[in-house]
């Protein structure tokens, strides 16, 4: 007989019915000759009972059952007695008395029990077992629901799902490409796509108006908890749109996914702040809006300070983020922190380049010598008054200061703000705090390379009010350097993590060539790498823009997990290896010869 029910679907309404169940032995217990088995499939558990008095043959077979054996059990649904009801199981009010048992497969003894706390490496080595865990099955089923919600919503909004090539040409997008050698074209290589960026733009030029794809992308970069060498994007592009159109559409997709998968209502419209505001108030371009603390800028008032550290930072000149900055972060109630705790936070900001962490404990008004700190004696009344007005500090508060290059101050105090907010439990009640960050700079100055780089990618459109600065012969006026040119780019941030990013694209050939020129990509290189795009732009390209949502990150945050590896079926380690399949691996010399390749790698010999 074929399966009639999933394990977790059997309920009191089926009492008296005969059902056929299939699944794995989760647990087996022998109580006075009666054998109880928790049978598991992807939906959950149900208790099946083998009674020697009622059905001797299946009971005899049940003596051979062990963990993870695969069985088919046919039996009658019966109500459990009052004393045996299990309120912790969905099926805890019933059990199935087995009349017929088929053992479909046996199992070797497990290297670990599925409910054991084990190392991640062991989990990844035996991923096929780890995926049987209820929490992993929940995670992947949840991911499935998100994907189906997105597809349904975008299809209903007039989007066309189009697949783009996995084998394409190498183009610079900020990270290293994964390269694939061509056997048919010796010496040439494909690249696995870092994103479908150029193809989706070409689809807009081809007139498809609204495109989407749930797509695999590849980046050969150093990994951390929220990154993988291959990852999944919810990718979309729209024609004849402005930033607001893309952001509103994206909000509707995300809001629907939260509602369907979590039953959570996300307030709309999502708050919007500019990049400049994010950096000024929070120090990071992906601020965690659950934390109400803000940074305050003291640079101007500290330019004449007697405190050398503040004065030097306030008067430091430099291009881009190399100019000086002095900021303060008020920690409400932080005056209770011990010196040891403050030293720990000082070490923490050192990770981000800060040379120290000045502080003031507010024990009373500054006019009454109520501020406790080694730096107070260097501060004049005007500076103290400015600090008080900026922070509105109260008795019991703690003030942390950053003084250095803007890049160091923003990063260190921005990260400290998040750390303090979480460790001191200063998060607001909003569990999912979304924010749009808009008007990113178009370009960033690389001080080491002495050249401009694209903040997002070379195809991002500049803000229409700032295009004039790109068109100047020298690239920009003295009063308005290129780093101040804004872009029509926008990021969606959730709880301090970027979950999506996009922009309006350049649809004018001359402007696109100018952008490449500013990035020091010459005509020959531009033609070689982007010639197909530049040609397409000349044949009636519409205004267009889009966005990509990181599916792995989004699901991780929705489930409150720490690592995206827990929402991916077969992830890689932080060394980009698969412990289960042992990929990457050596290949046969004949395969390399076919590809006209040979390895020059020489392993280190033991000394």
UniProtKB/Swiss-Prot annotation:
The record marks 31, 83 as: Important for tRNA non-discrimination. Its EC number is 6.1.1.23. It catalyses: tRNA(Asx) + L-aspartate + ATP = L-aspartyl-tRNA(Asx) + AMP + diphosphate. Homodimer. ATP binds at residues 219-221, 228, 498, 550-553. Belongs to the class-II aminoacyl-tRNA synthetase family. Type 1 subfamily. Residues 197-200 are annotated as: Aspartate. Aspartyl-tRNA synthetase with relaxed tRNA specificity since it is able to aspartylate not only its cognate tRNA(Asp) but also tRNA(Asn). Reaction proceeds in two steps: L-aspartate is first activated by ATP to form Asp-AMP and then transferred to the acceptor end of tRNA(Asp/Asn). GO terms for biological process: aspartyl-tRNA aminoacylation. L-aspartate binds at residues 173, 219, 456, 505. This is Aspartate--tRNA(Asp/Asn) ligase. CDD domains: AspRS_core (cd00777), EcAspRS_like_N (cd04317). The keyword NAD does not apply. It holds the Pfam family tRNA-synt_2.
């Amino acid at each position: 007989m074929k399966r009639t029910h999933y394990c977790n679907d059997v309920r009191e309404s089926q009492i008296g019915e005969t059902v056929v169940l299939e699944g794995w032995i989760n647990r087996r217990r022998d109580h006075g000759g009666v054998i109880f088995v928790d049978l598991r499939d992807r939906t959950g558990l149900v208790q099946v009972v083998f009674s020697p008095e009622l059905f001797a043959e299946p009971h005899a077979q049940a003596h051979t059952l062990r963990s993870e054996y695969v069985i088919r059990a046919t039996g009658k649904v019966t109500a459990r007695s009052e004393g045996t009801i299990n309120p912790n199981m969905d099926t805890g009010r019933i059990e199935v008395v087995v009349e017929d048992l088929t053992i479909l497969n046996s199992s070797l003894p497990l290297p670990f029990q599925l409910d054991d706390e084990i190392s991640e490496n062991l989990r990844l080595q035996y991923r096929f077992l780890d995926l049987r865990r209820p929490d992993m099955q929940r995670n992947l089923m949840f991911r499935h629901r998100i994907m189906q919600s997105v597809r349904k919503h975008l299809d209903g909004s007039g989007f066309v799902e189009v697949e783009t090539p996995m084998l394409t040409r190498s183009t610079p997008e900020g990270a290293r490409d994964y390269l694939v050698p061509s056997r048919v074209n010796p010496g040439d290589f494909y690249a696995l796509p870092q994103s479908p960026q150029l193809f989706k733009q070409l689809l807009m030029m081809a007139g498809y108006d609204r495109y989407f794809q749930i797509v695999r992308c590849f980046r050969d970069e150093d990994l951390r908890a929220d990154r993988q060498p291959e990852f999944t994007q919810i990718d979309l592009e729209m024609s004849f749109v402005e930033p607001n159109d893309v952001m509103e559409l994206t909000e509707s997709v995300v809001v629907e996914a939260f509602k369907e998968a979590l039953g959570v209502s996300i307030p709309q419209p999502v708050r919007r702040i500019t990049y400049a505001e994010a950096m000024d108030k929070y120090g990071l371009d992906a601020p965690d809006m659950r934390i109400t603390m803000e940074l305050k800028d003291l640079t101007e008032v500290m330019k004449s300070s007697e405190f050398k550290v503040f004065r030097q930072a306030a008067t430091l000149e430099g291009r881009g983020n190399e100019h000086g900055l002095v900021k303060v972060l008020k920690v409400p109630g932080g005056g209770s922190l011990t010196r040891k705790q403050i030293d720990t936070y000082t070490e923490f900001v050192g990770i981000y380049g800060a040379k120290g962490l000045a502080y003031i404990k507010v024990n009373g008004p500054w006019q009454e010598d109520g501020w406790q700190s080694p730096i107070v004696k260097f501060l004049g009344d005007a500076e103290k008054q400015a600090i008080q007005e900026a922070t509105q500090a109260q008795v019991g508060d703690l003030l942390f200061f950053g003084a250095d290059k803007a890049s160091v101050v923003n990063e260190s105090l921005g990260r400290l703000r998040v750390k303090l907010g979480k460790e001191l439990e200063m998060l607001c009640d909003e569990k999912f705090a979304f924010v749009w960050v808009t008007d990113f700079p178009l370009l960033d100055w690389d001080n080491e390379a002495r050249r401009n780089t694209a903040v997002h990618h070379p195809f991002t459109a500049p803000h229409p009010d700032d295009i004039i600065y790109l068109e100047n012969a020298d690239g920009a006026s003295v009063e308005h350097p290129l780093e101040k040119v804004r872009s029509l780019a926008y990021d969606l941030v959730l709880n301090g993590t970027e979950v999506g990013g996009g922009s309006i694209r350049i649809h004018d050939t001359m402007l696109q060539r100018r952008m490449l020129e500013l990035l020091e990509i010459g005509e020959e290189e531009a033609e070689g790498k982007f010639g197909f795009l530049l040609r397409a732009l000349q044949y009636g390209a519409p205004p267009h823009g889009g966005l990509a949502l990181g599916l792995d990150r989004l699901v991780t945050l929705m489930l409150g997990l720490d690592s995206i590896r827990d929402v991916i079926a077969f992830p890689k380690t932080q060394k980009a290896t698969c412990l289960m399949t042992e990929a990457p691996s050596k290949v046969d010399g004949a395969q390399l010869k076919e590809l006209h390749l040979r390895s020059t790698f020489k392993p280190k010999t033991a000394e």
